Regions:
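Charged, low-complexity, intrinsically disordered terminal regions
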Residues: 2-4, 144-147, 163
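Extended, charge-rich low-complexity interaction segments
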Residues: 155-163
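Short amphipathic alpha-helical face segments that pack within enzyme cores
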Residues: 58, 62-66
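RNase H catalytic domain
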Residues: 10-16, 65-154
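Intrinsically disordered, low-complexity regions of eukaryotic proteins
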Residues: 31, 62, 143, 162-163
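RNase H-like nuclease fold core
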Residues: 1-58, 70-73
Length: 163
């Protein structure tokens, strides 16, 4: 069976240089039914890059990692293919190995996501990643935005579409 994972990250910046970070992940089954969705937040998270500049990239990486992790914990039987979609070109290209990770603080996030993907592949699951425009990522974006505003969402348990 084919499953699709949509992820997104968001930061609501504050005057003190910190931000409220939100992450969202949505998993669809092969019939495009939502089988899992979740929004997570990390309030007042300071995630400056190597140049001391605030970046949204950590939130994007965290969203991908948490989505992969949640799916692996609640993994449905018979998942043969996982298609991953996100609107962060940087995260998609770096995880695929097409772009170098220039910011040292992002390398650990990229490595964690790649390790998760390799676990799926080791079990015979075909994994692909694709960049999509923000307009096609609205459910994950909405979860991330709401989580950054302090409204975490925990939804239905992941289940096999045969249930």
């Amino acid at each position: 069976m084919i499953y699709k994972l949509y992820f997104d990250g968001s930061c609501k910046y504050k005057n003190d240089g910190s931000c409220d970070m939100g992450m969202g992940a949505v998993v669809l089954d092969s019939r495009n039914n939502i089988v899992y969705e979740q929004g997570w937040n990390t309030p007042a998270y300071d995630h400056k890059d190597d140049n001391g500049i605030l970046s949204n990239n950590v939130a994007e990486y965290q969203a991908l990692f948490r989505g992969l992790d949640a799916l692996s914990v609640k993994r449905p039987d018979g998942i043969s293919e996982l298609r991953i979609y996100g609107d962060s070109k940087l995260v998609i290209e770096q995880v695929q190995g097409n772009w170098k990770v220039k910011a040292a603080h992002l390398k650990k996030y990229r490595d964690s996501c790649v390790a998760q993907i390799k676990l799926y592949e080791k079990e015979g699951c075909k994994v692909s990643l694709e960049w999509i425009p923000r307009e096609q990522n609205k459910p994950a974006d909405r979860l991330a935005q709401n989580a950054a505003d302090g409204m975490e969402r925990h939804s239905n348990q992941l289940h096999d579409e045969r249930d």
